[in-house]
Amino acid sequence: MLVDLIARKMREEGYTIVAMEGNLLPLPEDEKIPIPWKIRRHRPDVIGIGMKSRRVCIGEAKTHDDLFSRRTATQFGDFADIIGKSSGEKAELIVGVPLRSRDTLLQLLEKMKLHAEDISIILMPEELADDENEDHL
């Protein structure tokens, strides 16, 4: 569900989804969106392209526990390498987390010296996050 919210925000901001983990978008029967390609060592959940601006948007969903992992730190570091370098324009990063994880995410971004103007945050209400976790059990 969080990946869907990230994809929706991308579309609202004018990006066309070109790759998405799980292929959850409603598409005609014959069409599929490819899984995202790796950015350095990591594959994001969603990639969008601004067809007019040619900007890239990277979307990544994280659980609360993910925010404490070394993998998340290296992943954000890899993504940060292209923020500001996409076709001479700034690439955007959208991160989705459960509402309770907001402060933890902000602390991680600050520790990594990733600036808020390059990153959008989507906060998912706990009730929805709990439902999503139950679906994966």
Describe the residue ranges of each PLM region.
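Domain-level recognition of nuclease-like catalytic cores that cleave nucleotide substrates
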Residues: 92-137
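Conserved catalytic cores of phosphodiester-cleaving nucleases, focusing on short active-site segments
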Residues: 44-69, 79
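Acidic-and-aromatic substrate-binding clefts and catalytic sites of carbohydrate-active enzymes
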Residues: 38, 67-69, 99-101
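Active-site metal-binding core of divalent-cation-utilizing nuclease and nuclease-like domains
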Residues: 16-53
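Structural motif
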Residues: 21-23, 62-63, 97-100
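Well-ordered, non-membrane alpha-helical segments in soluble/globular domains
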Residues: 1-4, 70-80
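Nuclease catalytic cores
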Residues: 1-11, 15, 19-22
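Arginine/glycine-rich "motif VI" loop of SF2 helicases in the C-terminal RecA-like domain
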Residues: 80-90, 114
